[in-house]
Amino acid sequence: MEPTSRTFPTAVSSAQGDPRIAEITQRGVAEVFPGGAAALAERLATTDRPLRVKLGIDPTRPDLHLGHAVVLRKLRQFQDAGHVAILLIGDFTALVGDPTGQSEARPRLTPAEVEENARTYLEQAGKILDFETPGRLEVRRNSEWLARLTLSELIELQAQMTVGQMLAKEDFAQRYRSGTPIYLHEFLYPLLQGYDSVALEADVELGGTDQRFNLLVGRELQLWKGQTPQFCLTVPLLEGLDGYQKMSKSKNNYVGLTEDPLTMYSKLEKVPDQLVERYFELLTSVPPSELPADPRQRQILLAKTLVAQFHSSEAAEEAQRTAQALVLQGNLVETGSIPTFAIQCLSYPVKLSYILRESGLCKSAAEARRQIQGGAVRLDGQKVEDPDLEFAQASELDGRVLQVGKKAFCRLVVGTN
């Protein structure tokens, strides 16, 4: 895919005046090497062509979460500044398994698992990256070149690093000291990731702070092949909702990119106080000067901002109203635990008493009417008073929370056969 033509600044001083360059090189950045943020800013300001900016993601799990969004947003910033984002799906390296941060070897995935995960990754990355503007994005798979390496080429690649250099990687060093097995295929991983930069002729590579070693290997291999070595930009690892561990689905401290607005809002409005500013910095473009002084209002703004970002402003407003409505008698209902009821193939108008019966919240339509008359039924937290209440169309029901008494809830979802 050829990059679109574009006029770039020619003076280094423009780096100081271009807010896009400042955002790329400073906001939400842990480290830039070599030369720091100033060196990358100068390169961005003086380049006469779009830079090729690489981000590799191994599809080891089926879904993305906000931890992945941090580096994807950084890649989007390069896109918005006119550069070429390369989203590299590590379909080959996922079969090897990245040893970074692992106290033991990763379980091996099957090609079918990797392919299915890759499919969902691409769908979800579209919530952040620009997939529409011609020339702004290349989606590549490293099996394109890694699967074709011959044995002699692989030996030559391995000859570029020593065992001592590999053991300088902290994860390997800890396992070596503790006597935990290190398998030979794991030593290959940094070399394969580095070779990706050679194959793509990357100018910049992005990654989390835990990827520093692998990014540096990419620079060394580019030098070996006579290429100009890439800049490396790392972003912080996002702490999860527990407040201290890295966000991870396995730790159940995550917010998924595809979670519904109400669940996403309800999780985010409870982000620990000490992490709210960090979430704003890494996941939004809201300036620090615009953050409310009140800690609770900061949490609410964070939740609304991110729901709007991944869904819509309307969805964020509705999620806030519903979440507030679910604060009943001082007890917050955990919205993530509310079951859903799929309303399928109903003819409209439909009575609320029918839905109460079909959802199982009431045993019969007669009981449903009695519960309504007794003031026990609420819709999005608002008491329902009319036992004959009807809904004319599906949109009046979809996504709303129906409640009977203090503990019986369901979220209504309009489905189809």
Swiss-Prot record:
A GO molecular-function annotation: ATP binding
One GO term describing the cellular component: cytosol
Gene3D superfamilies the record matches: HUPs, RNA-binding S4 domain, Tyrosyl-Transfer RNA Synthetase
Chain location of the short sequence motif 'KMSKS' region per the record: 246-250
One GO BP annotation of this record: tyrosyl-tRNA aminoacylation
CDD domains: S4, TyrRS_core
Domain S4 RNA-binding: 350-414
Binding site for ATP: K249
Self-association and partners: Homodimer.
The protein, known as: Tyrosine--tRNA ligase
